[in-house]
Design a protein with these regions (language model features):
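Amphipathic alpha-helical segments at domain termini/boundaries
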Residues: 5-26, 169, 174-208, 216-228, ...
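Catalytic-core regions built around general acid/base machinery
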Residues: 46, 93-105
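A general structural signal for well-ordered alpha-helical segments in protein cores
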Residues: 40, 75, 153, 162-166, ...
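Intrinsically disordered, low-complexity segments enriched in small/flexible residues
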Residues: 222, 236-240, 244, 256
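Terminal peptide-recognition signature
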Residues: 25, 43, 61, 74, ...
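Conserved CoA-thioester-binding segment of acyl-CoA-metabolizing enzymes
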Residues: 2-62, 99
């Protein structure tokens, strides 16, 4: 007898698929692809694995499902943080993903099919070339819960500039359209649907997989010039976030958000 799927929730995962020189890293979490520490760790490890694999020439970073790209930090884990050390460790997960992408010798193509919040915007910014659909609105919501986009900030600012980054940060409850994000440089292209987007992603990935790896590595190094201090900078930002997340303001704001959503 076929079992009912009512109430069934897929389990979280991070998986990597390798095919014809292209590594596709896909992550999923049933809560709108939110990012608990173990997912962040696995994404960083997967990027490193693809980087070390000589058969891989280009990487695609995507999330599962067809609605949200990434809801950012897991609120459940934020609420469970008891001290500064735990806070620093959690936020270091975002630093590790961004730094893994930054130091990866291979181009990373981002695939953003839906809304991106906080760390999801940071992850998109850490890719080298990002595709999106028209449903991929973005928001940096950190200030609304009493912290700030400290860890992802350098990656976002590098991609869209200080003015647009300031606009996103200070309007922490506002969604900005995919078209706005394209105009600011976060997204290279915005498509009507995932079918059109995936066709173009595959075309670019195949072209890059047949390009000179040495030339691509040199180009990537040039593109990321000026970020050599990010190992230290992002960990410093993680410490700052780890302190702020312990405040009563943040605890109350997260509780209020969870009750209303």
């Amino acid at each position: 007898m076929q079992q009912s799927l009512k109430g069934y929730k897929m389990k979280e995962y991070v998986k990597i698929d390798k095919n014809e020189g292209i590594a596709t890293i896909e992550f999923f979490h049933p809560q709108s692809n939110s990012l608990p520490a173990n997912i962040l760790h696995k994404i960083a490890i997967s990027i490193n694995e693809a980087d070390y694999d000589e058969d891989i020439k280009v990487i695609i970073l995507k999330s599962g499902g067809d609605r949200a790209f990434c809801a950012g930090a897991s609120f459940d884990e934020l609420m469970s943080i008891k001290n500064e050390k735990e806070g620093e460790k959690f936020f270091s997960g975002f630093a590790n993903v961004i730094n893994a992408a930054r130091k990866c010798s291979k181009f990373i193509i981002g695939r953003v099919q839906g809304k991106a919040v906080g760390g999801g915007v940071g992850m998109s910014s850490a890719t080298d070339y990002c595709f999106a659909t028209k449903y991929a609105s973005i928001k940096l919501s950190e200030l609304a819960i009493g912290i700030g986009p400290f860890v992802v900030g350098p990656a976002v600012e590098r991609k869209i500039g200080l003015s647009a980054y300031s606009t996103l940060t200070m309007n922490a409850t506002e969604w900005f359209s995919a078209q706005w994000a394209r105009e600011k440089g976060l997204f290279s292209h915005v498509y009507e649907n995932t079918t059109e987007m995936d066709k173009k992603i595959n075309e670019l990935a195949k072209n890059l997989a047949n390009s000179n790896p040495e030339s691509m590595q040199k180009l990537k190094n040039i593109m990321w010039e000026g970020t050599e201090n990010w190992d230290e900078l992002l960990l410093q930002r993680a410490r700052e976030s780890g302190k702020l997340v312990l405040s009563n303001f943040t605890k109350n704001a997260i509780n209020s958000f969870k009750k209303n959503n």
